[in-house]
Amino acid sequence: MIVIFLGPPGAGKGTQGKKIAKKIDLPHIAIGDIFRTIIKTSTSEAELINNYVKQGELIPNEIVNQVIKNFLLSSEYKNGYILDGYPRNLEQAKFFESFIKEKIKIIYFDVSDELLIKRVLGRYSCKNCGKIYNSYFLQPKTDNVCDVCGSSTFDYRKDDNEEVIKKRIEVYKTETYPLIDYYKNSGNFYIVDGSKNEQEIEIDIQKILKIN
């Protein structure tokens, strides 16, 4: 099974990707995480990618496509995966279809701009276990103590400020809305209400994928 999660930054793709991947025992491939890992390396490619991220610009298709292809053609992904954040436009979708022949399901997370901004601005995670929190909606039960592992060290994403987030949303709309129209005609396109809580969204996705 190959499942693509589409939606703007802050839509909840990463949270649901991890949940559903664990439930159906498939890898969750988060494109943002892949590129954040690359940025931490001391390479010219990392510097180039980091410049795009800082400015709120999308990374060029040729860079994204090659990185993703290298990942997806690995043997560990031969049985399927949940793909979070790719493709983001028609060019990427057609490149993806050129080397992936399996049937896919596309799930789009529909969320208002106002809610997206709060979700992204408030987002942080436990540095030890990766548990995601939000200063607006989901704080640890005990201040500065992770609910899962008890760590008191948290990671706040440096590229998350309101101006950059708004720009990322607008760039996303320009790039991705034509892709959504393209996938709507595929017969395997589904929309979930991303403003619901985590449990409700998870249930909606399980129904789409026909899993318990």
Curated annotation (Swiss-Prot):
Family annotation (InterPro entries): Adenyl_kin_sub, Adenylat/UMP-CMP_kin, Adenylat_kinase_CS, Adenylate_kinase_lid-dom, P-loop_NTPase
Residues the entry annotates as binding ATP: G10, A11, G12, K13, G14, T15, R123, I132, Y133, K196
Binding, AMP: R36, E57, L58, I59, G85, Y86, P87, R88, Q92, R157, R168
Chain spans, region NMP: 30-59
Molecular function as annotated in GO: adenylate kinase activity; ATP binding; zinc ion binding
Biological process annotations from GO: AMP salvage
Domain of life: Bacteria
Assembly description: Monomer.
Domain writeup: Consists of three domains, a large central CORE domain and two small peripheral domains, NMPbind and LID, which undergo movements during catalysis. The LID domain closes over the site of phosphoryl transfer upon ATP binding. Assembling and dissambling the active center during each catalytic cycle provides an effective means to prevent ATP hydrolysis. Some bacteria have evolved a zinc-coordinating structure that stabilizes the LID domain.
Statement: the UniProt record of this protein carries the keyword Kinase: yes
Keyword terms of this UniProt record: ATP-binding, Cytoplasm, Kinase, Metal-binding, Nucleotide biosynthesis, Nucleotide-binding, Transferase, Zinc
Coiled-coil residue spans: none
Protein residues bound to Zn(2+): C126, C129, C146, C149
PANTHER family reported in the protein's UniProt record: NUCLEOTIDE KINASE
Physiological role: Catalyzes the reversible transfer of the terminal phosphate group between ATP and AMP. Plays an important role in cellular energy homeostasis and in adenine nucleotide metabolism.
Keyword RNA-binding attached: no
Residue ranges of the region described as LID: 122-160
Gene Ontology cellular-component terms listed: cytoplasm
Catalytic activity: AMP + ATP = 2 ADP
Family: Belongs to the adenylate kinase family.
Annotated compartments: Cytoplasm
Stated name of the protein: Adenylate kinase
Catalytic activity, EC: 2.7.4.3
Pathway: Purine metabolism; AMP biosynthesis via salvage pathway; AMP from ADP: step 1/1
